[in-house]
Amino acid sequence: MFRRLITMCAALSVLAAAGIAAKEKTVMVGGAAMYPWKDIIDNAMNSKDHTTLVAAVKAAGLVATLKGRGPFTVFAPTNAAFDKLPKGTVDMLLQPAHLDMLKGVLTYHVVPGRLDSKMPKEWAHKGKATTELKTVSGDALWVAMKDGKLWLKDGKGMTASITIPDVYQSNGVIHVIDTVVMAK
């Protein structure tokens, strides 16, 4: 009897996990599958489009944080987004002397909680054209819906397009963006 109960519990656990995995589909980013049961770092490390971001997260000592429980919403700039920065900026940020600046840039791309693309659509229906988000760095970042597409506006007034929304992770969600956003 006890053995049957254990077997039934195990089967229910497998079914529950399958239901969660089915709800949060696997998305391809940078030529790699982003599995919803893996954490933000484990998935990002597999994306060939996010090698600069991963190197920056490692240099800033933020790997353990982003492997933590979260949940986190990460607006993940691609390598091409980092390439848009003035020449030498990335190399300068990766130097130990600029660690605090690097952490500030990276934590500006992270919002506590798990915010998916449905939220701005819901806010838009409530008459909000733009919604302010409080980032981990403590600065404001704005999200807006324009022509059916999600956009970020940073503290300097620059915009970034969310090119791949809702890449679910075990500890949050990633939204791929085409521009590095900056606080004031």
Where are these regions (language model features)?
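Bacterial N-terminal signal peptides that target proteins for export
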Residues: 1-9
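Cys/His-coordinated Zn2+-binding motifs and related Cys/His-dense segments, i.e., zinc fingers/knuckles
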Residues: 2, 19-20
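Bacterial N-terminal signal peptides
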Residues: 9-16
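Mature, structured domains of secreted/extracytosolic soluble proteins
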Residues: 20-184
